[in-house]
Regions:
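Hydrophobic (often cysteine-bearing) scaffold residues that line and stabilize catalytic clefts
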Residues: 13-17, 89, 93, 153, ...
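Short, polar/flexible loop-turn hinges at active-site or ligand-entry regions and domain interfaces
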Residues: 7-11
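Metal-assisted phosphate- and nucleotidyl-transfer catalytic regions
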Residues: 23-142, 161-187
Length: 187
């Protein structure tokens, strides 16, 4: 599920997502869902887990936006996570989190503070840290929703989409293409 609202940031969108899911649960008459991973309580606490702190806790090593890709490759090898040797540190962090931490998140959890390459359309973090204002909602160990504070700076957007188009040209199936019409509309 992905949804956006004009002038709303990631926190407003998280509340909207929670409201939508809980309304659906009420409509079908259940507050809990039994799964092979455990009981999902849709009306319990909805936690927030930062990508870097969450990964750090799971692997027992402090991971920050400054962590070198070589360290992350060693962690991937130790945890038997398949990676592409061409991936940079941001991509490695995102993949490691998805493979190591995400499957352990049974109850609703907003995973937030991703590296910029994870969502090129998201606004830079208001703290000034090299992060973006975006989250994925994980329920039952799987991504069930996503949203972000939308990037409205055409200069930053062009830089990100240009970088993404280079990744796409190099064979990255998840990278975005350069969209000149979109960029002109922002300008």
């Amino acid at each position: 599920l992905e949804c956006y609202e004009a002038y709303a940031d990631q926190f407003v969108m998280a509340e909207r997502m929670k409201e939508i899911i809980q309304s659906c649960a009420k409509a079908v008459g259940t507050e809990r869902v039994e799964t092979e991973n455990g009981t999902i309580d849709l009306f319990g606490e909805w936690k927030w887990v930062g990508v870097y702190p969450g990964l750090s806790e799971a692997v027992g090593v402090e991971i920050t936006p400054e962590t070198d890709a070589s360290v992350l490759r060693e962690i991937a090898e130790k945890h038997e996570v398949d990676i592409d040797p061409k991936w940079d540190a941001e991509k490695l962090v995102t993949e490691l989190f998805g493979e190591i931490v995400e499957p352990t998140l049974v109850n609703p959890t907003f995973v937030y503070d991703y590296p910029p390459s994870a969502q090129p359309l998201a606004r830079p973090h208001r703290s000034g840290e090299p992060l973006i204002e975006a989250w994925d909602l994980i329920i039952g160990g799987m991504e069930r929703g996503t949203a972000f504070s939308e990037l409205i700076d055409p200069v930053i957007q062009r830089e990100r989409l240009t970088a993404q188009s280079l990744l796409a040209a190099a064979g990255d199936d998840e990278a975005m293409e350069l969209d000149e019409d979109f960029l002109r509309a922002l300008e």
